[in-house]
Amino acid sequence: MENSRVLSCQYRSSFGSSNARRIRAKSEIPAVVYGQGKDVSHLRIKSSEFNKKFAKFTDNTVLILDDGKLERCVFVKDVAENIASKLIYHIDFYEVDRNVELEKYVPIKLIGASIGVKEGGILTVLKEQVKVRSLPLDLPEFIELDLTPVNKGDSVLLKDLVLPSNVRLAENDENLEVVIIK
C-alpha cells in the first residue's frame, strides 16, 4: 500500500462537543466514517499526520484508515475548519469497498503548449472533468491531456484521452469534444 495514502486512526467511544474539545487539546482531530450499508464509526486522528497529507488531497484522493486491525478505504467527504486559525475541527470520511468499481468525475489537467495556440489559435476548453470507472485505489487524481501536438482547427475528443490501464471512460458519448483550437 502506498504509504502516502495510509492514515493512522483510533476508535473513540465518547462523543459530544466537550469530548471533541478534549481530543483537539491533545492535538488530535475527531472524525466519523460512514458509508452505504455501513455502521457509523467515531475516530480520532493525529493532527500532524492529517495536516501533512491534507495539503496533497483532491476530491479523488482515496485514503486508507488504519487502526492496527482493520484498513478502511475512504474518501474525505467534509472537513470542518476554522479559516482564520486553520484549525481542523472535524472530518467526515466516506467508506467504499475497495473491490467494487465506482464512477467518479476526475479533472482534466492540460499540459504542454499547443502548436495551434503558438500559431495564433484560441484554445477553448469544453470539458474540465471526465467521468471514469475504476476500483477506488486505481482512481487517478486527474487525467493529463498533452496539448503539444494539437494544431489550429483540431479538437480533442473524450476517446482521445489517455487513461491509466485500470481506468475506463464512463461517459455516454466518447465523441464529445474536450478542447478545440480555432
Curated annotation (Swiss-Prot):
Matching Pfam families: Ribosomal_L25p, Ribosomal_TL5_C
Sequence intervals crossing the membrane: none
Gene Ontology MF term list: 5S rRNA binding; structural constituent of ribosome
Stored PANTHER family: RIBOSOMAL PROTEIN L25/GLN-TRNA SYNTHETASE, ANTI-CODON-BINDING DOMAIN-CONTAINING PROTEIN, RIBOSOMAL PROTEIN L25_GLN-TRNA SYNTHETASE, ANTI-CODON-BINDING DOMAIN-CONTAINING PROTEIN
Similarity comment: family membership: Belongs to the bacterial ribosomal protein bL25 family. CTC subfamily.
Quaternary structure (record): Part of the 50S ribosomal subunit; part of the 5S rRNA/L5/L18/L25 subcomplex. Contacts the 5S rRNA. Binds to the 5S rRNA independently of L5 and L18.
Disulfide links within the chain: none
HAMAP family with a match to the protein in the record: Ribosomal_bL25_CTC
Function: This is one of the proteins that binds to the 5S RNA in the ribosome where it forms part of the central protuberance.
Superkingdom of the organism of origin: Bacteria
Native source organism of the sequence: Borreliella burgdorferi (strain ZS7) (Borrelia burgdorferi)
GO CC terms in record: cytosolic large ribosomal subunit
GO biological process terms on file: translation
SUPFAM superfamilies: Ribosomal protein L25-like
Keywords for this protein: Ribonucleoprotein, Ribosomal protein, RNA-binding, rRNA-binding
Name of the protein in its database record: Large ribosomal subunit protein bL25
